[in-house]
């Protein structure tokens, strides 16, 4: 197995010692490591201390390290699909790019599932199809949001007339992406170490709010004396509880 960071040998010894499959040990270790590293983005890499570019780069590098540790060269599938989708976003008409991106990404993911069905049937080992499913959600949501914003921008006069006549904002969109992200923003989003392995899906706008440190300042709680620390505690509590459920579920599967 590809071992660019010299950790596979350690996990192989640990697997022999515990009797647990190496891919399961690696996955649990990576998830726990990601949880322990995440708070540094609120301390050492706080938006007031680190630039958005630095936060993107660190998150991207960690994502690549974690994914390559778990999946080895299979990580190239994720990079290939992301790159193809980025080229589509840059070259295809924005009014049609959402459907083309959906077809391409789902087709590639389906081929990966079919490959596993025919050549690795009844295999319970973890593979790159998990992160690929998360990637398909990210790529298609990005393409559809880009299309929606450009379509509404193109028909802004019609939308304004409709609002004036009916008193509603039926064409209002929640996420505003009017141009294709830069390469750093795109790959930083796709390979974010917190969502790369098993999700959850985070929309591009939400990711950029986190990168720029706007996720707490923009979404303030109601004026009830709550502070940012309260928000952070709630987020961390929910995050750890969800990850703990995932780890416990995986452990139960290993014991069955």
What label would you give each PLM region?
Residues 1-256:
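Membrane-embedded transmembrane alpha-helical bundles that form the catalytic cores
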């Amino acid at each position: 197995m590809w071992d660019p960071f010299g950790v596979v040998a350690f996990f192989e010894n640990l697997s022999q010692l515990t009797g647990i499959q190496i891919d399961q040990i690696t996955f649990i270790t990576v998830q726990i490591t990601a949880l322990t590293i995440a708070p540094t983005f609120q301390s050492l890499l706080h938006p007031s201390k680190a630039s958005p570019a630095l936060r993107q780069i660190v998150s991207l590098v960690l994502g690549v390290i974690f994914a390559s540790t778990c999946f080895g060269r299979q990580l190239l599938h994720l990079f290939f699909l992301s790159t193809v989708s980025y080229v589509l976003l840059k070259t295809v008409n924005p009014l049609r790019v959402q459907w083309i991106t959906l077809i391409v990404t789902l087709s590639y993911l389906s081929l990966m599932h079919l490959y596993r069905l025919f050549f690795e049937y009844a295999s319970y080992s973890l593979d790159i199809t998990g992160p690929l499913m998360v990637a398909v959600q990210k790529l298609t949501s990005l393409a559809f949001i880009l299309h929606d914003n450009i379509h509404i921008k193109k028909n802004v006069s019609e939308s304004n007339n409709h609002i004036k006549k009916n008193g509603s904002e039926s064409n209002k969109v929640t996420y505003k992406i009017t141009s294709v992200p830069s390469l750093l923003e795109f790959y930083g989003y796709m390979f974010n170490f917190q969502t790369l392995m098993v999700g959850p899906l985070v929309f591009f706008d939400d990711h950029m709010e986190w990168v720029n440190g706007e996720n707490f300042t923009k979404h303030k709680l109601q004026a009830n004396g709550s502070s940012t620390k309260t928000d952070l505690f709630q987020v961390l509590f929910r995050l750890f509880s969800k990850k703990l459920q995932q780890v416990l579920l995986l452990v139960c599967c290993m014991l069955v």
